[in-house]
Amino acid sequence: MVLGKPQTDPTLEWFLSHCHIHKYPSKSTLIHQGEKAETLYYIVKGSVAVLIKDEEGKEMILSYLNQGDFIGELGLFEEGQERSAWVRAKTACEVAEISYKKFRQLIQVNPDILMRLSSQMARRLQVTSEKVGNLAFLDVTGRIAQTLLNLAKQPDAMTHPDGMQIKITRQEIGQIVGCSRETVGRILKMLEDQNLISAHGKTIVVYGTR
């Protein structure tokens, strides 16, 4: 849930006035898995990928977060927590950062900020539940199709005469659904043959999704 634009949301303006604003280039790392959690982040502009790595360094993308989303909120509720995932800039980002200690002080003054954060956490829990269900009940073709539909709803998806256009590599799709890049390529070709999508390099048009 996007909190709103700074010029039209007094609560957001007030919150951001207590934060430090930092800019991150695309593909830079905002949060390292395993580091001590002491800071809450809020995406002012841009989007990020939340991911985990196994012992061999293989990555799995858990989610994408966009403008108006909080990051790193779990450590807010229990001291001594370590970051459970990596967060990497998907695009160039402008991010507001505030210590947990200062955030706790702010919500004493304006509890609405905490309500907004809680609403986001509830929505993410619902998305996670749906993803677990997809892993359990959908085959890899279904998971890829569902992923494309979800990506077509992201803020950085672009309108296209035939649907919605997204930019994503086969490797990234594989990291989301848990399969190889080669498998993704075969399934995208199959979806193309069924006239459900068109795929050219990183550009995919998902038909009929506007």
Curated annotation (Swiss-Prot):
Look up the coiled coil feature and give its residue ranges: none
Write out the residues that bind 3',5'-cyclic AMP 1. Answer: 57-63, 72-74, 83-84, 128-129
Spell out the residue ranges making up region: Activating region 3 (AR3).
53-59
DNA-binding region per Swiss-Prot/TrEMBL record? 180-186
The segments labelled Activating region 2 (AR2) in the record are 20-22
Q: Name one GO biological process term.
A: positive regulation of DNA-templated transcription
Q: Where is this region: Activating region 1 (AR1)?
A: 154-163
Its keywords, alphabetically, are: Acetylation, Activator, cAMP, cAMP-binding, DNA-binding, Nucleotide-binding, Transcription, Transcription regulation
Entry-annotated residues carrying N6-acetyllysine: 101
- Keyword presence, Lyase: no
Gene Ontology annotations for the cellular component aspect, listed alphabetically: cytosol; protein-DNA complex
Q: Phenotype when inactivated?
A: Decreases expression of genes encoding virulence proteins. Drastically decreases survival in host macrophages. Decreases virulence in mouse.
Please tell me where 3',5'-cyclic AMP 2 binds in this chain: 136-137, 171-181
Tell me, in a sentence or two, what this protein's role is: A global transcription regulator. Complexes with cyclic AMP (cAMP) which allosterically activates DNA binding to regulate transcription. It can act as an activator, repressor, coactivator or corepressor. Induces a severe bend in DNA. Acts as a negative regulator of its own synthesis as well as for adenylate cyclase (cyaA), which generates cAMP. Plays a major role in carbon catabolite repression (CCR).
Oligomeric state and interaction partners are given as:
Homodimer, which upon binding cAMP is able to bind DNA. Binds the N- and C-terminus of RNA polymerase subunit RpoA and sigma-70 (RpoD).
Protein name, please? Answer: cAMP-activated global transcriptional regulator CRP
- The record lists the organism as Salmonella typhimurium (strain LT2 / SGSC1412 / ATCC 700720)
What gene codes for this chain? crp
